[in-house]
Design a protein with these regions (language model features):
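Alpha/propeptide regions of enzymes that mature by internal proteolysis
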Residues: 1-320
């Protein structure tokens, strides 16, 4: 098993755009002129998404043409319109006779409390991300959907840390499996291989870590206003030949990577979602893809927080 760049998969282009001052951005994954099969598994209690019904195994469409990860919560769902315009201009989409309709799925995270709540990803920003995808401007850290991402928010934003977007991919023989993830969790992030806490909830001194799970358990009977602005958004890529049903299962198995790296995870305060996309025709066992997928997803989560820089008054892991 060797590490490879997330950009080494065929038939994808990844572009990002952001409004740094406004504290938000979007990441667009274009899936080629013919699109690609995809599945989705949502485990969090508060998702903001678009066209997710397309990815159910019984839905008619067998491929989609792009995936958008963005900030802005439900407001940011406007961004997909820019991707649709970009693809329509290039004749990419589902042929309905009179035109071609691009099938664009999107999931958003909540970053409205980071900088300017009135600044959200829109069609113009997503169109710019598509243009950037032509040359490939993907970077881990405070970019794209990770621009306003934070973690460790159980006690409010004054106790959280800066996060971002991260990636990790491997190759085993001919099989490639990779993950891209924007980490905006209410919980803490751990290196699952060492048990070390990388980023998360900070004590009042701003320097000491608290354990979010222990804090939550102590508040079991205490009245509280739960902070609802969270969500970790991931995409699992593989060149294995998988249909929608199997991709939905692979996405579900990749959620194990969330559980390894984020504590607590899949709460009512999160909208945790994972897409899975098939980008090739390599024969591979579904369970093998899922096991590798969970591993690369956990590694990508750690990379997202380690690559982040302090911003908007929130310290990053490298500052602790």
């Amino acid at each position: 098993m060797k590490e490879i760049p997330i950009t080494s998969f065929d038939n994808i282009q990844i572009g990002q755009a952001e409004n740094t001052a406004g504290g938000t951005g979007c990441t667009v994954v274009l899936l080629g002129k013919d699109g690609a099969p995809a599945g989705l598994d949502v485990r969090g209690g508060g998702p903001a998404s678009r066209e997710s019904e397309l990815l159910k195994p019984l839905a008619a469409a067998q491929v989609i043409h792009a995936i958008v990860l963005a900030g802005g919560s439900a407001f940011g769902l406007d961004a997909a319109g820019g991707v649709m315009r970009y693809l329509e201009e290039r004749g990419i989409g589902f042929d309905v006779g009179v035109t071609k309709v691009p099938l664009v799925c999107q999931s958003d995270l909540f970053d409205l409390t980071v900088a300017d709540a009135r600044t959200r990803p829109d069609a113009a920003m997503a169109y710019a991300a598509c243009v950037n995808a032509e040359t490939g401007n993907y970077r881990d850290g405070n970019h794209g959907a990770g621009t306003g991402a934070t973690v460790g928010k159980l006690l409010g934003m004054e106790h959280c840390m800066k996060s971002g977007i991260g990636s990790y991919a491997v190759q085993v023989g001919d099989l490639k499996v990779g993950a891209l993830v924007a980490v905006n969790a209410v919980g803490d992030v751990y290196d699952f291989e060492t048990g070390r806490k990388v980023a998360g909830l900070r004590a009042d001194d701003g320097k000491t870590f608290l354990d979010s799970e222990r804090v939550l358990m102590r508040q079991l009977d205490a009245p509280q206003e739960k902070f609802v602005g969270n969500t970790t958004l991931g995409i699992l890529f593989t060149n294995a030949k998988l249909d929608k049903a199997r991709l939905c299962k692979a996405a579900g198995m990749a959620h194990d990577g969330y559980a390894r790296a984020i504590r607590p995870v899949h709460t009512s305060m999160d909208g945790d979602s994972i897409y899975a996309v098939s980008l090739g025709d390599v024969p591979a066992d579904l369970d093998a893809v899922g096991v590798i997928g969970a591993r690369v997803m956990a590694k990508a989560i750690v990379r997202a927080v380690e690559a982040a820089d302090s911003a908007y008054g929130f310290p990053a892991a490298r500052d602790m």
